[in-house]
A protein has these predicted regions:
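Pyridoxal 5′-phosphate
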Residues: 1-192
């Protein structure tokens, strides 16, 4: 539909890169944005943007690239066009190591294990009084991410308790999606 109306198709791969096989050509993806620190097992501050061949975008930053240092404007060649400043060499190496590890394990094996663990968690958490799970709770219907609340408790407080008492790391809050939280009624409380 998007292609028919000359609309670019940008996919947010935050929860899928490293867990699901993403074929940008088969899926007709124009751009795929992904963080390196989640499913790709790289360090924070890494990530990438796939841009379909032939797609012309305007850079948003201007600055030295080291590749055409004499120029006062951003180079018009890829990837330099979108990479102002000094590259994060250690971060890129760490991201490369994460991707190598994923390829060794096999993305299908990772996906199956994460889905198995997610479904087990959903089944067990559903049995606990006061826990509210959000989203579609059907097996195989979503990425291996679970959002929940415990009664009316603040999500940050629940996160703190899980960390301090049980050594369980979670991320509380609005998860960079305030409008989604307004839609499901969790804007004030956030979710765990």
């Amino acid at each position: 539909i998007a292609k028919k109306h000359n609309i670019l198709y940008l996919v947010d791969g935050a929860q899928s890169a490293g867990v699901y096989d993403i074929d940008v050509e088969d899926m007709n993806i124009d751009m795929l944005a992904f963080p390196g620190h989640k499913g790709l097992l790289g360090p924070q501050g890494t990530g990438g943007l796939y841009i379909r061949e032939g797609l012309e975008l305007t850079e948003i930053f201007q600055g030295g690239t080291g590749s055409i240092s004499h120029s006062l404007i951003q180079p018009d060649v890829l990837p330099d066009k979108f990479e102002s400043g000094t590259p994060n060499g250690p971060g890129i190496a760490g991201l490369g190591a994460g991707v190598k590890y994923i390829l060794e394990l096999g993305i299908e094996n990772i996906r199956k294990k994460e889905e198995e663990l997610t479904w087990h968690f959903i089944e067990e958490a559903s049995k606990i009084e006061g826990i509210k799970l959000y989203g579609t709770l059907e097996k195989g219907s979503h990425a291996p991410v679970v959002a929940l609340n415990v009664k009316d408790a603040d999500s940050s407080e629940i996160s703190y308790i899980l960390d301090e008492k049980y050594d369980i790391a979670v991320r509380p809050g609005l998860h960079c999606a305030p409008l989604a939280h307004k839609t499901i009624g969790t804007f004030e409380q956030g979710v765990v």
